[in-house]
Regions:
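Acidic, polar-rich low-complexity tracts and alpha-helical solenoid repeat scaffolds
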Residues: 1-265
Length: 265
């Protein structure tokens, strides 16, 4: 079946390190596969039902729609055939994924909220270890990464409520980019980290008039330098979509730096 053969080449790729591939038309291969599978099923009813449903489950799985993936795997598991045993194993794995996703996250207390996120990270890390070397390891890493990024966002939003919140946010970003250096989102995180330093620099300018005597140019320059280093790291890498964005941020930062210097003279 050509409809299955085309996307199976990508079904086991590392979705943590690499984005899902595009087909010749530029469409996500997993989304395209779902459309083609539906079309094939309409035109050829009751043919290769187990293969169609197993392939559909795999595509949903790659797209992290675990409910739809489970529904399709269960259809295959209800049939006698060579894909039944594998479907049963996949059902067990995805049910474990669902159990983690369904863990309650209390929102009333920020410290309880952070503890709940930490618990989820630990749960995903256990699944990463359990499924090491399989495609489920990659999915578990993606889910773990998602929670890690949410933790940083929460700290950043609430930094004014925390003692030394700016330093804590910098530490959180540092941990994120260190832990997920192999992620496809790594350069996105580096840019976000740079953006935070720019935000700190702008906050410093807003709180301390550059034309006044209280303004310390060295403090501003250190923040700008930290941002520039992060932006430059991204801008120096060829073949990534974030490169042009990083170059634009460097130019904007230079403009800000020049403006503040003129005011501070």
């Amino acid at each position: 079946m050509d409809v299955v053969k085309d996307f199976q080449r990508f079904a086991r790729e590392d979705v943590y390190r690499f984005p899902i591939a595009k087909d010749v038309t530029g469409v996500n291969v997993m989304k395209a596969a779902l459309v083609r599978l539906d079309d094939y099923e309409r035109k050829n009813p009751r043919q290769f039902t187990d293969i169609i449903n197993y392939s559909r489950a795999t595509a949903y799985e790659r797209l992290r729609d675990y409910n739809q993936a489970l529904a399709s795997y269960r259809k295959v598991a209800a049939m006698e055939g060579p894909l039944r045993a594998e479907s049963l194993k996949n059902i067990e794995t995805l049910e474990a994924f669902k159990a983690v996703l369904d863990q309650p996250i209390p929102t009333e207390d920020p410290f309880v909220y952070m503890k709940a996120l930490d618990d989820r990270v630990d749960s995903w890390n256990e699944l990463v270890k359990k499924h090491q070397g399989t495609r489920f390891e990659y999915l578990a890493r993606v889910e773990e990464e998602k929670i890690d990024r949410a933790k940083v966002a929460f700290i950043e939003i609430n930094r004014f409520r925390l003692t030394d919140g700016n330093h804590i946010t910098i530490l959180a970003f540092s941990q994120l980019v260190t832990k997920h250096r192999q992620s496809k989102n790594y350069y996105r995180y580096v840019l976000d980290f740079g953006d935070f330093y720019v935000r700190l620099a702008k906050d410093y300018v807003a709180e301390n008039d550059p034309e006044g005597l209280a303004f310390d140019m060295k403090v501003f320059e250190q923040l700008a330098k930290s941002a520039l280093g992060l932006y430059t790291e991204v801008a120096s890498v060829d073949g990534i979509v974030e490169k042009i964005e990083a170059q634009g941020k460097i130019e904007a930062l230079r403009g800000l730096n020049d403006k503040v210097r003129r005011l501070n003279r």
